[in-house]
Structure formats: C-alpha cells, structure tokens
Amino acid sequence: MPKMKTKSSAKKRFKVTATGKVMAGQAGKRHGMIKRTTKFIRDARGTTTLSAPDAKIVKGYMPYDR
C-alpha cells in the first residue's frame, strides 16, 4: 500500500505538540482591525489550541505528525 500524503496546506497552518494538541494561529486578524477593541487585538496574538473535534480533523490531514 502506498504512503499516505500530508496535506500541504495543513502542515503550513497547524502544529501538533508533543502531547498531541493542535496549535493554530488566531483567526480574524487580516483586515478591519481599526474597529476592533484593544482587548480583542491583544487577545488575538500568538496561537491557540484547537478544540477536540477540530483537532481530530486536522490530524487526519497530517498522518505522520501524531
């Protein structure tokens, strides 16, 4: 049986930690930030952990990053 392929778009956007959690960048920061509150902008920095159902889907895209 041939090797499974990793989705190139997923490996660029997500990172699986050593404990199995999936990290992703915060969404909603591309444009329109002038009308956002300072708290929103501050809280949207860095990365966030995906929820369990979303993490399961993303792990399916990256079979060798578990």
UniProtKB/Swiss-Prot annotation:
Lineage: Bacteria, Pseudomonadati, Pseudomonadota, Alphaproteobacteria, Rhodobacterales
Protein name: Large ribosomal subunit protein bL35
Keyword Ribosomal protein included in the entry's annotation: yes
Keywords, ordered alphabetically: Ribonucleoprotein, Ribosomal protein
Family: Belongs to the bacterial ribosomal protein bL35 family.
GO molecular function: structural constituent of ribosome
GO CC aspect terms: cytosolic large ribosomal subunit
Superkingdom assignment: Bacteria
Pfam family for this entry, one: Ribosomal_L35p
GO biological process, one term: translation
